[in-house]
């Protein structure tokens, strides 16, 4: 049965299902984050009959507000304005920060009561309206449950409101939980919120084990949603145009990207270790393609200049990652979703360290021979081993490519559980309607 027939048949059996998705990363400055929400939308549409999807964007979760005290007890609240330095300095002198979200778990109930009483964020009423109209509230946990991120803490609070005040079926899916080695504010939020959620899916093994170790027994290990896209993304036309302009037709190349951690970038007469690494890899007779979307990785454009390489920059769409990596001999990267796209396209990879255990997790998922990433902050020490790893990948590329594509096909099938669990939750209703107020 084709997917279209399947959806038509199920639409006859199910009424419309309204899902409120928190954390739409479409406008995020990261290709992987953009690909995540694209994949989730595609997955939901294909596996949840008659779905109606409402979404709260990532930047909504990061908005800052300030208040000006007016005569009497009146206050004027406005969204922080950053477009003019002089104007912002003046406004900051006559205003104070307006806090509408809790910073720690102990304050969740106080702020939830304020929200329900309409004494909160100017957008609180809008969120409550949209959450009330939804059959279920789902938080896309991409890029947030670590480092006490503002958007992560706020999204957890929104789930708390949806679950404990509005009694909505609620879920967090597709997330990495890395609650160690940070100022510990998130662990308490997770410890109290996750047990009362209807669905919790973790996308990599280490985060899943940590969540399970906190007593959250119903948490499930489900591969990242981007695996669902496989190598089916249509970015070929735009990529081919760039490839011809870059003079890469018929030229063997490798790709290298950065990481969320800082790397040794070129400065003045200092080339830095990234340039040195690229030059070492060029000795295999390959043309370097430096890949960067995130602002912190744009130094790779200078690396491309110094090495005679090509720069694949932020003007490109995430859709073009698949054809880019499909033609590469290998990828060196500390970006989680770049590795997923590369593996799906049959491109072997060399993992670089990041600021959490995502990279180790994707290596385990892919049953990759090397699960310990190379330290991107100490390339000078690990460069000989990294170059040897590149030599191994080149030697065994064909076999490695076939193994990666077979494995990602399996992970694609398993990733659908993100949508299946949301569908079951919204259909069956919430399993927890009360909680012990502290």
List the model feature ranges, each with a label.
Residues 8-438:
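Active-site anion-handling motifs in enzyme catalytic cores
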């Amino acid at each position: 049965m084709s997917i279209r027939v399947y959806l038509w048949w199920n639409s006859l059996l199910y009424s419309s299902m309204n899902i409120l998705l928190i954390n739409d990363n479409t406008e995020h400055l990261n290709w992987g984050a953009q690909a995540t929400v694209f994949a989730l939308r595609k997955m939901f549409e294909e596996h949840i009959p008659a779905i109606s999807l409402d979404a709260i964007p990532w930047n909504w979760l990061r908005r800052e507000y300030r208040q000006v005290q007016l005569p009497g007890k009146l206050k004027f609240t406005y969204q922080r304005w950053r477009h003019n330095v002089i104007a912002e300095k003046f406004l900051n002198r006559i205003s104070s920060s307006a806090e509408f979200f809790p910073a720690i778990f102990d304050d969740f109930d106080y702020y939830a009561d304020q929200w329900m009483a309409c004494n909160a964020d100017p957008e609180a009423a809008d969120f409550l309206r949209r959450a009330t109209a939804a059959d279920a509230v789902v938080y896309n946990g991409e890029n947030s449950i670590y480092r006490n991120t503002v958007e992560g803490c706020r999204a957890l609070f929104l789930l708390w409101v949806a679950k404990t005040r509005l009694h909505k079926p609620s879920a967090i899916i597709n997330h990495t939980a890395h609650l160690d080695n940070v100022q510990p504010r998130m662990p308490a939020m997770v410890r109290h919120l996750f047990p009362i959620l209807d669905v919790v899916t973790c996308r990599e093994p280490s985060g899943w084990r940590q969540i399970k170790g906190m007593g959250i027994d119903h948490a499930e290990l489900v591969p990242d949603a981007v695996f669902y896209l496989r190598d089916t993304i249509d970015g070929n036309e735009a990529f081919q145009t760039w490839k011809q302009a870059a003079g890469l037709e018929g030229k063997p190349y490798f790709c290298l990207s950065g990481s969320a951690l800082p790397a040794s970038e070129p400065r003045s007469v200092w080339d830095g270790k990234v340039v040195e690494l690229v030059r070492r890899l060029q000795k295999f007779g390959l043309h370097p393609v430096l890949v960067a979307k995130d602002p912190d990785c744009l130094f790779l454009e200078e690396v491309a200049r110094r090495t005679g390489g090509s720069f694949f920059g932020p003007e490109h769409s995430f859709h073009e990652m698949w054809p880019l990596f499909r033609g590469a001999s290998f990828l060196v990267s500390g970006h989680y979703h770049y590795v997923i796209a590369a593996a799906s396209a049959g491109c072997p990879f060399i993992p670089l360290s990041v600021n959490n255990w995502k990279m180790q997790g994707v290596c385990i998922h892919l049953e990759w021979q090397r699960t310990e990433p190379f330290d991107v902050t100490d390339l000078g020490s690990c460069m000989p081993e990294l170059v040897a790893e590149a030599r191994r990948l080149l030697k065994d590329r064909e076999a490695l490519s076939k193994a990666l594509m077979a494995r990602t096909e399996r992970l694609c099938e398993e990733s659908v559980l993100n949508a299946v669990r949301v569908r079951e939750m919204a259909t069956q209703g919430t399993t927890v309607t009360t909680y012990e107020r502290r």
